[in-house]
Amino acid sequence: MLRALARSARRQCRFSSSDAPNRVLPAPRLDYRHIAENVVYKTTNAQNRKAPIDHDAIQSVARAYTEFKTISSALNSQRNARSAVGERIRHSAKENDAPAKEAAMAEALTIKEEIARLEAELASVEETLLSLALAIPNDTHPSSPLGPESAAVELSSHGPNPIPATPTRDHVAIGRQLGLLDLESAATVTGNSWYYLTNEAALLEMALVNYALSVAIRHGFIPVMTPDVARSEIVRACGFQPRDHADQAYHLAGTSQDLVLCGTAEIPLAGMFANKIYQDTGLPLKVVGVGHAFRAEAGARGKDTHGLYRVHQFTKVELFAVTTQEQSEKMMEDMTSIQTSILSGLGFPFRVLDMPTEELGASAYRKYDMEAWMPGRGAWGEVSSLSNCTDFQARRLHIRYRGAVQPDHPSPTTFAHTLNGTAAAIPRLIVALLENGATFDDEEKLTGIALPSILRPFWVGADTKGYIQWQ
């Protein structure tokens, strides 16, 4: 039964010792004891999060952990016996006691064979244990709402009152009329859910990137330009399943490594800290990265695919932090404040939501979403999110820290906590700015776009067409 569950878990997690020759990360260090001692909570938590694991998987981890401890104890006993019989061999040789030496050597051979058997059995159980445990999602913050997306709790609202929904404010129609958006050429060149930003829309993207960067840097985040490609094992360690059909990541063909186009700059930013040990006094570490996000599933959700709202590639500014275990909850509130500051400066209505269990994915302990009002869509739309992943990613990426070093007594290492949040998802922000900022004359004819003056210092060139109004 354990082996069958492990095979199923390996198919979900895509972890196998056969990957070892090309791997850059050691095997994940998961807390099996915590899982085994909290089977009821872990099972309920997985159900609340709609985790794609077998109903008996967590109980199976507890059973496998018991088996692991039993074999480990037997193996340690045999290793102690090997040491003792080795001492007897040396003593009998010194005393020229040939019969005693021969008996001890025969016993040593038996012990050697038993150790080899136990080591093989332990390795098999450990692989089963790891494969099962990797499929278990993170714990959940006690304040997180239970249920689907509709159960999200509004924590705060910001900006002006939402203007009435109307199709005249559709961002695609506005973009086409003002020469800002070319979906037809993109469909010819690449396909559906790709786009060209032209004229002032291209300048708007650059202004938004630099504006978000400036706010993050002002709050102590170090700027980073990230790779857009990562190894699959790094992607998996961050909590994503790049070979899972639901994720539909883009994979690079014709390479000797299993490389993936990143769905978020969170992945290369997290990878920066892999296999490193930090001093606790040097934490938190805060970086802000600019990268391109690639999402192969863009065409999967009906009306969300309209225009710029859900696309295959977009520019994204990402916040990432590594903290001690005690710092992460405060860091989440600090990062929320930064995100709120960025969105408040853009002048459209938005709200902050505490996301429910079914929206947390595998890695998040708690997640906030920020949604902007988009009157052309007639709905609120996510423009930012923030997740505290506690030690979920750190245990897989081996991000650790230690306390003060004592002479002759090196302090033990502890797995760090990681947090990630969107500073700016550019196409979604452009949707919100166009749909809220469009201006019309008395006959409801489009006359231009009102943009927040906070972007003006980051604007390259002049508004040659004269339809931008800075407010």
What is the predicted role of each segment?
Residues M1-P162, L180:
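N-terminal alpha-helical targeting/anchoring segments
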Residues T70, S157-Q471:
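TRNA-recognition modules of translation machinery and tRNA-sensing kinases, especially anticodon-binding
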